[in-house]
Amino acid sequence: LYVSPIKHVRVSGLGMQKTPSLQNAYDLKSPDDNVELYSAWAETYDNDFIEDMQYKLHFSVAEEFVLNGGKGLILDVGAGTGALAQALLQKGKFSIEATDISEEMLKVAESKKIYERSFLSDLTEEIPMENDIYDGVVSSGTFTHGHVGPSAMVELVRVTKPGGLVTISVNEKHWIALNFENEVEKFNKYVRNYTLKKISIYGEQSTHDHKDDKAIILTIKV
């Protein structure tokens, strides 16, 4: 696949320094905090987090997307280093575009040659795309804690074509604390239906403090 240069849509001024860690990721409060943490973490993220902490949520999101008929041109939201796209491509042929708030994470993702193109975006604002562009939208690990709340889901539906599919994960505690299901119900009349599934975020052999954390996989048929 041809990988285009990152499209610059946001420049942030960074604040306090963040040491890369899962707890600091859970403690993020603002877009700038997010940019700073993941800029520092990008080069070692795959080893430090995905492998060492037995993160497996991206596999579950990919499986649900495919089982529900996901296909075509896909937007990977909060793509990070590309783990979800890699999981999808193990299950079939997709054309995938990436967006993330972190330029450094997208650089790592681009190096894997799995995306058609990538661009920067902030989910607390509009995704810089017109309506009804993608056949599907996926996201793994972006709706965790911190600044990305349930209102951002409307943007994911907006850029998805009628008849398309949105499959995202939301940390279970975040889902409950911010009442994500209430937000889903608000726009439910504008979509065909949605389903919820609770799954483990980490592997059975993980031993860290968050090893028992769960996530809700939300699948919306637009």
What feature does the model see in each segment?
Residues 192-222:
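Class I S-adenosyl-L-methionine
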Residues 151-162:
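A short glycine-rich, Lys/Arg-flanked "PGG" loop and its adjoining helix->strand segment in the class I
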Residues 8-44:
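N-terminal, positively charged/glycine-rich alpha-helical extensions of SAM-dependent methyltransferases
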Residues 139-142:
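A short beta-strand submotif of the Rossmann-like class I SAM-dependent methyltransferase core
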Residues 167-192:
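Conserved class I S-adenosyl-L-methionine
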Residues 127-137:
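A short acidic, Gly/Pro-enriched loop at the edge of an enzyme's catalytic core
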Residues 46-62:
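Conserved SAM-binding loop and adjacent beta-strand
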Residues 75-126:
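Class I SAM-dependent methyltransferase SAM/SAH-binding core
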